[in-house]
Amino acid sequence: MSNTSIRIAVAGAGGRMGRQLIQAVAQSEQATLGAALTRTDSALCGVDAGELAGIGALGVAISGELAAVKDDFDILIDFTRPDASMAYLAFCRRHHKGIVIGTTGFSDAQKEAIRAEAQETGVVFAANFSVGVNLMLKLLEKAAQVMGEEADIEIIEAHHRHKVDAPSGTALAMGEAIAGALGRDLARCAVYSREGHTGERKAKSIGFATVRAGDIVGEHTAMFAEIGERLEITHKASSRMTFASGAVRAAVWLSGQKRGFFDMVNVLNLDKI
């Protein structure tokens, strides 16, 4: 596949993120919308994807059958639910299609299965497709190397009332970045809730706090607190378009890869920072 006019399929086309993805693909000079997908029983089947996204007709009817559009796309972008994502991934592997996965809430077993499928097809899997968030993850590694051994580390995240998983995938990615830089296992040092008489803070733990309210698109802060000073690294998203544009960028990049497991660090070439 070439890096011009990559044909993209958008899963979950009727959702908030799906509509943003349709808009982002339409704005891209390197990609076109090849297919838009929804549930088989959805009333949106047959509706023009562009009309649904509020940008005018694109000539692409929303479909409830992935098999019916398998020849219409090169890369699938999926921001849905874990079970649906696993089915999309299996289909893409069988039909040699690349897939960009922005779904969160996967189990550890599902994450391992995604890595296994990537041996046969191209996969970009990231908790967050914002350029700023992925740069923040690299900054957190640097901060952890300098302050992490002595500082109390807390991660605070806030999202809209409709988000169904907590902590967010991005918050967990932040924790993994920090723990990895410190040689720690996040599964052993994470503290996800505090209530009642908790006692003093456990040394070398990484705490998480979650807010769900209103229409907050996404806010994440990592705090490195020492006695007398603290460093806070924060990212705030004001529009889902930042995630959608990043996902389209990832899809265009993935079109040049035959197979393999990648994340936004690879897409943005942040390895050298």
Swiss-Prot record:
Subcellular location: Cytoplasm
Keyword Oxidoreductase belongs to the record: yes
Record-level GO cellular component terms: cytosol
GO MF terms held by the record: 4-hydroxy-tetrahydrodipicolinate reductase; NAD binding; NADP binding; oxidoreductase activity, acting on CH or CH2 groups, NAD or NADP as acceptor
InterPro entries documented for this protein: DapB_C (IPR022663), DapB_N (IPR000846), DapB_N_CS (IPR022664), DHDPR_bac (IPR023940), NAD(P)-bd_dom_sf (IPR036291)
Keywords from the named record: Amino-acid biosynthesis, Cytoplasm, Diaminopimelate biosynthesis, Lysine biosynthesis, NAD, NADP, Oxidoreductase
Catalytic activity: (S)-2,3,4,5-tetrahydrodipicolinate + NAD(+) + H2O = (2S,4S)-4-hydroxy-2,3,4,5-tetrahydrodipicolinate + NADH + H(+); (S)-2,3,4,5-tetrahydrodipicolinate + NADP(+) + H2O = (2S,4S)-4-hydroxy-2,3,4,5-tetrahydrodipicolinate + NADPH + H(+)
Binding residues for NAD(+): G12, A13, G14, G15, R16, M17, G102, T103, T104, A126, A127, N128, F129
Quaternary organization: Homotetramer.
Descriptive protein name: 4-hydroxy-tetrahydrodipicolinate reductase
Natural source organism: Sodalis glossinidius (strain morsitans)
Lineage: Bacteria, Pseudomonadati, Pseudomonadota, Gammaproteobacteria, Enterobacterales
